[in-house]
Each structure stands twice: as C-alpha cells, then as structure tokens.
Amino acid sequence: MLNNGSDGLVDQHTRFLMRFDNDFKVDGYPPPNIEDGLEIKGGEFVTDSIRTGYKYTNTSNSYGMINTSSTLSPDLFGDGDPFTIDFWYKPLAVIDACSVGHEWYNGIFYFGIAGNAGDLGLFFATQRGANGSKVSDAIIGRWYHIAMVRVDYTLYGFVDGKRSVSFPCSNISLRYSNIDFNRQRDGSNRASFVIDNFRISDVARWTSDFDPPK
C-alpha cells in the first residue's frame, strides 16, 4: 500500500521521501533501506506559517548526507537511468554555497546560491560547475519548489514548476555518489536554508513546466 498521507507525494515511482514534521519521516515505495544510510547533523526543526522544515546553518557541524548506494536500488538507479529529485527550499541568507549536491567532485548536479559577485541567486550546475547558471534571485524567507530531472545526458532544473535550465550532465548512476545537504567541497558548511519534502523518484517526472506538489 502506498503511504502517501495527505500530500500524495508517495506513488509507485517514489523511492525515497524525507519529510520534516518535527521528526524525520522517511517514506517510499517500497520503504527504503535507511539503516546506516542517512546522516543528519547540527540542524533544527523550524515551523513558519506555511510548513515545517529542517534548518541548516553556516556552522561546521550543520549538514546532512544520504548514502545513495545503500538507500537506492541498483535495479532502478543504474547508469543512464532517469531520475527526479524535488524538494521545498527556503533561503535564510544569500551566501555563495551549495545547498544540495551530488557529492563533489564527479557528481551529476549541484544546487544552491551562486553567481557573480554582487549578483548571487538560485543556481543550478553540472560537470563540476562547468555548466551553471543563476536562474532566480534568492529572496530570504520565501519558499521555492526545486526540481532536478535527469534524462539521458541532460539535466533539467526547475524553480516553482518553471523549467529554468537544461545542461549536459553525466549519465552515471545516482548511486555513484552520496547526496549532500550543506556540505561544501572546501569543508566549510556555510549555507543557511530550510528544506522540506526531499523526494527521489525513479522516473523523469517533468521535462516541461508543471504545477508543483504541495
């Protein structure tokens, strides 16, 4: 039976869903193996008028990691297989930093705040940053729905359901590297944001504009 609660986020293609409702709730179909596969440190649950999420800050012990090789099935997430990662994201400061990334340095995708000096904003990148673009201003305290979709050798990036970028990317398995929250390649966990409803799906859910899930 699909454990989709009231938000409908779990369907037959949801393989990992991490909710932050004043507790860590991990769902999926079937339920994912999270033993030794999930590490969350140094943050806190926060609630605003819209939703409850998990807050990371620019301190050295505030980060998270999903061990993809233990939580995702090799039968569904092999080389070249499509996937979708989507989540809700609220910046708390405009700081040049990666918020969600496929572990440096050969990862498939990176999302956070970056750009030219004095012009930082929401930013997608692939191939160690060789392909990257600011796609929106980062408004402090505003919730954004973020989605990254891999189809063959292309990564599509979406903000609030609007397709913002399409970049060449690696077709390696998503299981090749871990997924990091607020862990920077230089060891400085300096981002400051809130995240909620982090979902990994085994299909390309969207390749054009869509209405974000709640």
Give the predicted meaning of each segment.
Residues 167-194:
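Flexible glycan-contacting loops in extracellular carbohydrate-active proteins
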Residues 78-80, 138-141, 172-174, 190:
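Surface-exposed coil/turn segments at beta-strand junctions on protein surfaces, enriched
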Residues 1-63, 210-214:
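Extracytoplasmic low-complexity segments
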Residues 65-73, 128-134, 182-184:
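Short structured motifs
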Residues 29, 36-63, 86-94, 109-171:
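Extracellular glycan-interaction surfaces
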Residues 12-15, 24-29, 62-121, 155, ...:
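Extracellular glycan-recognition modules
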Residues 8-9, 137, 189-192:
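A general structural signal for stabilizing positions within well-ordered secondary structure
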Residues 16-20, 85-91, 146-148, 181, ...:
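Short hydrophobic/aromatic patches on beta-strands that form ligand-binding or substrate-lining surfaces
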